[in-house]
Swiss-Prot record:
Residues 60-78 have a biased composition (Acidic residues). This is Putative protein 22K. It comes from the Viruses. It comes from Snake adenovirus serotype 1 (SnAdV-1). Residues 94-104 have a biased composition (Low complexity). Residues 35-104 are annotated as: Disordered.
């Protein structure tokens, strides 16, 4: 009988990433140094989110465009449609229980 390994899920945090980075990379580096280097690399790769006052090309939006965006956000804030209930399906319809004949 083979025993199955169970894996514990771990939340992804900077320290966990630093530990993985340290484990896979330069092992002479301390975890603190790996964490600082990882923060530095992540800071360089992440761009600040665009402000809602400007379009994607950096041009300022007109009043009409800003109103359209705010109306879209209000519409998105409404209650989501209800999720339909799942229909129960048989695994193999050919193996459905046969109807019994009435006994005489």
């Amino acid at each position: 009988m083979a025993s199955e390994k169970s894996y514990k899920t771990v939340p992804v945090t900077g320290k966990n990433l630093a530990m993985i980075y340290h484990h896979m990379g330069n092992k002479t580096q301390s975890l603190e140094e790996a964490y600082k280097q990882l923060e530095k690399e992540l800071g360089e790769t992440q761009a600040p989110p665009p402000s809602p006052q400007s379009s994607l090309d950096g041009e300022p939006l007109s009043e009409g465009e800003l109103e359209e965006i705010s109306e879209e956000e209000e519409e998105e804030g409404e209650a989501p449609p209800p999720i339909p209930a799942k229909k129960r399906q048989r695994k193999n319809p050919s193996k459905a229980p046969a109807a019994k004949a009435p006994s005489k």
